Amino acid sequence: MEAVKEKNELFDLDVKVNAKESNDSGAEPRIASKFLCTPGCAKTGSFNSYCC
């Protein structure tokens, strides 16, 4: 039983993750002016505009 206890302790990892919820991304801030928007509207950001 001692070998089993040592094996369990070997894989007993106490991991705490402190993550903050944020909407930050490399694309922020989004363009608010329609002058700089690309033509087209879609749900994706590639070659489409989020300004629509």
UniProtKB/Swiss-Prot annotation:
Superkingdom, taxonomy of origin: Bacteria
One Pfam assignment: Gallidermin
Cross-link Beta-methyllanthionine (Thr-Cys): where in chain: 38-41
Cross-link Lanthionine (Ser-Cys) mapped to chain: 33-37, 46-51
Keywords: Antibiotic, Antimicrobial, Bacteriocin, D-amino acid, Lantibiotic, Thioether bond
Propeptide stretches in the record: 1-30
S-(2-aminovinyl)-D-cysteine (Ser-Cys) crosslink, residue number(s): 49-52
Molecular function as annotated in GO: signaling receptor binding
Residue intervals passing through the bilayer: none
InterPro entries given in the database record: Lantibiotic_typ-A_Bacillales
UniProt modification remark: Maturation of lantibiotics involves the enzymatic conversion of Thr, and Ser into dehydrated AA and the formation of thioether bonds with cysteine. The C-terminal lanthionine undergoes decarboxylation. This is followed by membrane translocation and cleavage of the modified precursor.
Family as reported in the entry's similarity comment: Belongs to the type A lantibiotic family.
Protein name as catalogued: Lantibiotic gallidermin
Source species taxonomy: Bacteria, Bacillati, Bacillota, Bacilli, Bacillales
Name of the gene encoding the protein in the UniProt record: gdmA
